[in-house]
């Protein structure tokens, strides 16, 4: 009996391992950055400040695993060199988690790369592009990274407040689908009052 249980455990381990590999091997290809919309006449000063993450879509997002996605906030703080210090504040367990990084301006206004990228040895490239914003209510930001030779991309729907209109959410879904994403790759966050307002 002990040998049978061991064989069953090994088979299950192999199945789980192959499923985990399949989830990253079947990534929807990232669109070329040049084909992603870029906010015309991007204003760095107006974009800074706090944004709440209302929606998230990406080739590594799976609705069935992330259906109870908790809202977090991201603060863009403009620096003298036109880079942003970017702080994301997330709820983790009973505490708050802070993720701080720098977005350095790229060749076109509204495009950025991850500063100090050598501090992230698993990341080969990381690009950020503001696709659409009115600065006062919403923004749609495209992120693309190459990590361990796999290309991931996501689109974030930001709101200056925790709630956005159904029309803006539908616009976000249409934008995500125009990049090749499916309904299963799109989630909306559950608002929280913990951590993210401070």
Swiss-Prot record:
Pyrrolidone carboxylic acid modified-residue sites: 21
UniProt binding sites for enterobactin: 126, 154
Disulfide bonds: 96-195
Keywords: Apoptosis, Cytoplasmic vesicle, Disulfide bond, Glycoprotein, Immunity, Innate immunity, Ion transport, Iron, Iron transport, Pyrrolidone carboxylic acid, Secreted, Signal, Transport
Signal peptide: 1-20
Residues carrying a glycan: 85
GO MF annotation, one: iron ion binding
Tissues where the protein occurs: Detected in the ureteric bud in embryonic kidney (at protein level).
Record bears the keyword Ion transport: yes
Localization terms from the record: Secreted; Cytoplasmic granule lumen; Cytoplasmic vesicle lumen
Keyword Protein transport appears in the UniProt entry: no
One of the record's GO cellular component terms: cytoplasmic vesicle lumen
One Pfam family hit: Lipocalin
Protein's GO biological process: acute-phase response; cellular response to amyloid-beta; cellular response to hydrogen peroxide; cellular response to hypoxia; cellular response to increased oxygen levels; cellular response to interleukin-1; cellular response to interleukin-6; cellular response to lipopolysaccharide
Residues binding a carboxymycobactin: 72-74, 145, 154, 158
Function: Iron-trafficking protein involved in multiple processes such as apoptosis, innate immunity and renal development. Binds iron through association with 2,3-dihydroxybenzoic acid (2,3-DHBA), a siderophore that shares structural similarities with bacterial enterobactin, and delivers or removes iron from the cell, depending on the context. Iron-bound form (holo-24p3) is internalized following binding to the SLC22A17 (24p3R) receptor, leading to release of iron and subsequent increase of intracellular iron concentration.
Record text on subunit structure and interactions: Monomer. Homodimer; disulfide-linked. Heterodimer; disulfide-linked with MMP9.
Family classification: Belongs to the calycin superfamily. Lipocalin family.
Entry-linked PANTHER family: LIPOCALIN, NEUTROPHIL GELATINASE-ASSOCIATED LIPOCALIN
Protein name, UniProt field: Neutrophil gelatinase-associated lipocalin
Natural source organism: Rattus norvegicus (Rat)
